[in-house]
A protein has these predicted regions:
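Conserved donor-binding/catalytic core segment of Leloir-type glycosyltransferases
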Residues: 10, 192-221, 229
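Donor nucleotide-sugar binding/catalytic pocket of nucleotide-sugar-dependent glycosyltransferases
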Residues: 41, 131, 139-187, 195, ...
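Nucleotide-activated donor-binding/catalytic signature segment of Leloir-type glycosyltransferases, i.e.
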Residues: 241-262, 273
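Acidic donor-binding loop of glycosyltransferase active sites
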Residues: 269-285, 300
């Protein structure tokens, strides 16, 4: 690559099957003359019981390659078992200067990319934040991939600690999930606060680990009038409905299914605070909490549990309560229910948090910085190699 040529990057991400979920963060990169970005995503993806067709390309500045995948129905581990049978052809056509993977290092597609990338440096984006030994062959794949990775983009300090513990010694920087500010923005008309119950909301899967039981218990303990609106689907919904009935909260808790991004934004705009009370378990730990930044982008503060990445993502834009502690949550609800000014200030702080860390422009810059750094470091190593070899004694002497 000459100094005048743009850096050719091949980014591989199954999430990019969806424009809203995975592609918008790449859009700011199309304006950069120093980058030539090629994005690989599946033509079709199966996740959480749903099959999604790849959205059509919508940004002429990014070259989209929608490729068929194998093993996409190997749930619940399809994220780690899928491969692209035509990836070798794309590698030969693009001849990338840098390969970027938005996949975990033990995935088969990470192994595939390592075997096909040639001398191109590898940038790897990781979410996994629980240190554990993986079953064969995944532990061996992780070790193989990390040894050949030039730069890690970690979602959280816990995720960085995991790759360090597994032997990675290279450069690490941090990257969040971006938020679509055009969709997730403050309501045009602020919600009236006088004589209105405190309106809490939750968006996500309905499973026991999300801690919604703690929210219901806290509502029953609190002296203030509190309502909870739940948007999402999952196997734990019947148990939540039963618990709400047992606590006498049926008329204060509402359920609705998944919505489009625009519907999620309108749902959040009607809240006084969003809750994310995820519980840590031996197998799960909140890796980021994208709904946190969606709420903050709407100017809505967040109440989160002190677990996983939740506190670091919330920042000053909300409150953090102890995990699995309905009493502490009830006390917080009684404190903020009558204090609309405190909620407004935390909401404003959340907007600043998003502007500084989680806009798509910020995420795109984090990506570009990592790609350019990896390429520069690789070039330095190649330039230094002849001098290192001359300085080392010959094994035949």
């Amino acid at each position: 690559m000459s100094s005048a040529s743009p850096l050719r990057v091949l980014s591989i991400a199954h999430t990019a099957v969806s424009r809203a979920a995975g592609r918008l963060r790449y859009h700011p990169l199309a304006k950069r003359a120093d980058l030539d970005v090629h994005l690989v995503a599946p033509t079709r993806w199966h996740q959480f019981g749903r099959t999604s067709e790849a959205d059509p390309p919508d940004d002429p500045g990014i070259t989209m390659h929608a490729l068929p995948v194998w093993f996409q129905h190997a749930r619940p581990v399809s994220w780690y078992l899928h491969v692209y049978p035509t990836l070798r052809r794309i590698m030969r056509e693009v001849k990338p200067d840098v390969v970027h993977l938005w996949e975990e290092p033990w995935s088969l597609v990470a192994l595939q990319a390592c075997l096909l990338k040639g001398d191109a440096p590898l940038v790897l984006e990781v979410d996994q934040n629980i240190l554990k030994r993986l079953p064969p062959p995944f532990e061996a794949i992780r070790k193989f991939v990390l040894r050949r990775t030039d730069h890690i983009l970690a979602r959280s300090p816990d995720a960085a600690a995991v790759v360090r513990a597994k032997g990675y010694r290279g450069r690490i920087s941090y990257i969040g999930y971006g938020v679509d500010e055009a969709t997730f923005r403050p309501a045009a008309q602020p919600q009236p606060t006088a004589k209105r119950p405190l309106q809490l909301g939750y968006v996500g899967r309905l499973v026991a680990d999300k801690g919604l039981d703690d929210a219901l218990d806290a509502m029953a303990r609190a002296h203030s009038a509190v309502r909870l609106a739940i948007m999402g689907e999952g196997p734990y919904e019947p148990a939540l409905r039963e618990r709400a009935t047992q606590l006498g909260l049926v008329d204060r808790v509402s359920f609705q299914g998944w919505g489009t991004p625009a519907e999620v934004a309108r749902f959040i705009q009607n809240l006084d605070a969003l809750i994310l009370l995820t519980r840590a378990t031996p197998t799960t730990l909140e890796q980021f909490g994208r709904v946190i930044v969606e709420a903050q982008s709407c100017g809505v503060p967040v109440i989160g549990a002190a677990t996983g990445a939740i506190p670091s993502v919330i920042g000053a834009g909300g409150w953090v309560v102890p995990e699995r502690d309905p009493r502490a949550l009830a006390q917080l609800l009684d404190t903020i229910a009558p204090d609309s000014e405190a909620r407004r200030l935390r909401g404003a702080a959340g907007r600043k948090n998003v502007a500084a860390r989680f806009t798509y422009e910020a995420i795109a810059k984090d990506l570009a910085d990592a790609w350019l750094e990896a390429r520069a470091s690789a070039a330095d190593r190649h330039q230094d190699a002849p001098y290192r070899s001359l300085s080392q004694p010959s094994p035949h002497r």
